[in-house]
Amino acid sequence: MSIDLNWETLTTGPDGIALAERIRDFVHAKFQTVTLPRFIKGVKVHTFEFGSIAPEVELKDICDPLPDFYEDIDDDYVEDDEDEENSENSQTDEENEVAKTLRERRRLDRVERTANGSSHVSTPPAYIDTRYPGLRSMQASGDTGSPFLGVSTPGIPGGTSNLSYFHSQLASGLSGTQTPLAAVAGAHLPQGWPDRPSPSLHLSALRNQSHTPLSHTASERSMTPPQIADLNQQSLREKASVSTLAASSSTTRPATRDGVPEATIPEEHAGESEESTSPPRRFREPKVEDLQTVFRVRYSGNIRLSLTVDILLDYPMPSFVGIPVKLNITGLSFDGVAVLAYIRKRAHFCFLSPEDAYAAIGADEKDADASAGMKMGALLHEIKVESEIGQRENGKQVLKNVGKVEKFVLEQVRRIFEDEFVYPSFWTFLV
């Protein structure tokens, strides 16, 4: 179902101007934390404009929110609704600071897991099953023996496919609701969740099976069945930790709804002692009125971002002088899947990675027929940039490092977008 946006109302007027200024400040602050190459002195972001072209938004699904959206970021855990509302009014600024800290912690954990690869098995996500106590008894015994377990998927630490990601919770004995994308990608049960049947979710899971790559590595072919089972279990644990990114700081995981405490997980690295000082993750109790919508967003417009970069010249000595280079991002092309959840006067927003996007809504018919052009889930496809450097000689740029500067800036724009807006990173707004 397509949704029409009044783009002019959203992006103009006092509110639109203030929002554009906040985005400019945010991008500028992110560039100040980036490690610059030797030939660049500094980056300054001057203006941001939304442009006149509105994105195309299509509603794909309405379902239960992702488990990470229930994480409690208040200093004092509040279960009563009235106390929670009072806490929101008095601690808005403090919550924003804590939210920034949590996003930074998720980003650092993701970087650490990427560096360590499959050699490090992270702590599984400390999700608490609160809504579907009867789900374990309804699991099919044949699911855990699926031939798709352990399939290699490029770009995901741990080498596990999307389908094994969903089967991981079954294999480890956890509830289906503990799977971060079970809410959007479909349930494992033939009839969906017990209290919220959704045939579209089951169809999405079936579509996901048809797009799961079946390329095992040579080492997996040579392994005996017990070895393959061990490898699958290790990969499943790694995938579960990748979906959370905010590692639990305590050495024990919270007790499940059945009252059975989880096993103690020792620390493997001395560098993790700093994380042990941070408070453990806490989750709010889900309610029936909680809602999440899944959208497909397409955009090919004239959004503008103006910034300057100082290029250092090494003649007659290193870093002798800096010359400002003005870069204008004049447009970009985008195609991805967005998630918007509403939980207790809070709106949570994020985009899904390409793998999770296909798992959530399946492949579009237009994507299957298109041999070229944009492909769903690839997020930023194209960024148009123009550069200006003072005087020109015979229509050519005087400096030779302009191409390197443009490449560096575009890489940082992509990195900022993916680190801040792609799940498991998400933004929370008080509404």
Curated annotation (Swiss-Prot):
CDD domains: SMP_Mdm12. The keyword Glycosyltransferase does not apply. It holds the Pfam family MMM1. The keyword Membrane applies. Residues 241-254 have a biased composition (Low complexity). Keywords: Endoplasmic reticulum, Lipid transport, Lipid-binding, Membrane, Mitochondrion, Mitochondrion outer membrane, Transport. InterPro entries: Mdm12, MMM1_dom, SMP_LBD. GO terms for molecular function: lipid binding. Residues 1-431 form the SMP-LTD domain. Residues 79-96 have a biased composition (Acidic residues). GO terms for cellular component: endoplasmic reticulum membrane; ERMES complex. Residues 79-128, 236-285 are annotated as: Disordered. The SMP-LTD domain is a barrel-like domain that can bind various types of glycerophospholipids in its interior and mediate their transfer between two adjacent bilayers. Belongs to the MDM12 family. This is Mitochondrial distribution and morphology protein 12.
